[in-house]
Structure formats: structure tokens, C-alpha cells
Amino acid sequence: MSKKISDLIVTNSLESTDKFLVETEAGTKLAPVASVRTDVYNGVDLTVVFADEIAEYGDPWSWIKARARARNYAGLHVRDYIPWTLDGFTIESEIAGFEPDFECTDQELGGHIDFISRDCYPQYVQWNTSNVNQGNATNAAPYMVSNLKAWYDSKVNSLPTELRNAIISKRSLMETRYTSGQTLQSSTSWAWNDLGKLWAPHESEVFDRSVWSGKYASGNGTKYPAFADGRARLKHFGKGGGRCNWWECDAMDASATHVCYVANYGNAVNNSASNTHIAPVLGFRIG
């Protein structure tokens, strides 16, 4: 005799040999309780899982770019990663989020995937060589004229050609902090800017809010799903290295000298723009 689901007896006791009825892409299946994941998802190497599909494109970056443009994310998950090499160092770039700016920004955006390296590039880079967090007459946005952004720009030509060709620049609403002849403690407005092919994330993209940054620093910042818990905020000084501090792209509010970063404990902090013991992560957008 058939029963309605509402007529079934509720149980709080399951054995490993009991089964769930599940809907999969291949149809309705039975799944044993023992197969249900209870561990934390750490992502998979996409070049292994999709090796056959990638082979049709010749390289993983052409493949993932085609996927993003088609808005085809089947089988892809936040924290899945693609390994590659920069300056002899192994980088594992993981999916931070799918389409965080779809149809947004001042230049309407189509399908895209944002990647952030699982660990830092193993080099300390000053946010600024002088201890200031100001914009200037060329661009009032502090990050846009920072030493950190200049460092990112200097690395673009060292990227693998296939990756460089797959990346699109990231548009972002950036805080502005500049008045000729004055040193400002807080940002006074914002403006759309092109962050380039490599970048550091906003504080709001990591913590979902401004902790040390000001009200103009998170105008279009959406928290990346990869940072849903503290594990992804912990970065290491290169793959296999020790825990390290890493930069964000925001100036600290109520300070003319400090900027925002993530501490080696995973928490939001600030320090001098000229600090020499903070490393960069590698963020980029494929689309």
C-alpha cells in the first residue's frame, strides 16, 4: 500500500546501511547514510576532475573562461581550485564566488568567476613605501595609487599566457581620500575604478562588513562565499609555509596612515601602510 510522505513515521535513529532517496543528474537514486558527507568541503583540483573536458580546450583557463561566459557552473563548487605556477612558486587559485557582480557595476557585467589564491605569494610587499593611505591628484582612490597595486600590475606579464588571456579586469567602487594640501583621516567619497587583472579583496568581501574601513569602502562589496568560515581567511606564506598576514585594498577609517589587512589568526586588523611583514594574495576574475 502506498503512503504519502506526511504519513511516514519520523525517525531520529539512522544506521549506516539505511538509505536516502536522492535526485541526481543521472536520475533518482538510493544513497546509503554512510555516503553522506559530514566533513568540511575543502575543494577539489578541477584539472583532475574535469581533465577530459579541459583537454577539449587545451588548457584549464580557456576551459573555465568558456564555462563562465556560458554561465555553466555545473559540477563546480566554491573552494574548488586550479593549480598553476608563478615565478617558480605553486599557486592554488580557488573559486571565491560565482558572479558576485553579475549585471552590476558601471559597466554591466556578464557571467564571471572570481578566484583568490589559497595562500599568499611568498613575498612581503608594502601597501605603500611611505606611511600614508591617501590618494593623489592622479587618482583620489588610495588603493589605485598604492605600491601594492603597482606590485600587482608588475606581475601581470609574468602570468601564464593562457591565464592572462582568460582574466578580465575587476571594476569596483573605490573609496576616495584626497584634498590638495591636506592629510585626510577618512575617505570623503567613492568612484568606479578598474582594479586590473590582479588585486586584493575589500574588507567587506572577506568579513561581510566594514570592520576597520569606512563607509565609502564597501559600496559594492559582496562577501565571497569562500570566506563563510575562518578557514579560508587563514593564508600561508606560500604553499606549505607558515600562517601569514595578508593585505586588503581598503584604507583604515579615522587614520591617515593605516590600512586594512587579515591577520595570521584570521581576524580583521589594521596596520601602517608601510608595514614590511604583510604579504599579498592573488585575486583575479575570469569571464
Model-predicted segments: where are they?
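Sparse, context-dependent recognition of short Cys/His-centered cofactor- or disulfide-binding micro-motifs
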Residues: 5-7, 21, 265-267
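Short, surface-exposed beta-edge/turn micro-motifs
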Residues: 16-19, 278-279
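Generic cytosolic/nucleocytoplasmic N-terminal low-complexity/intrinsically disordered segments
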Residues: 2-3, 18, 28, 148, ...
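Short, structural beta-strand-to-alpha-helix junction motif
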Residues: 3-4, 32, 202
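Short, surface-exposed terminal/edge motifs of secreted or surface/virion proteins that either
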Residues: 22-40
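Collagenous Gly-X-Y triple-helix signature in extracellular proteins
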Residues: 41-287
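Short, intrinsically disordered N-terminal pre-domain segments
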Residues: 1-17
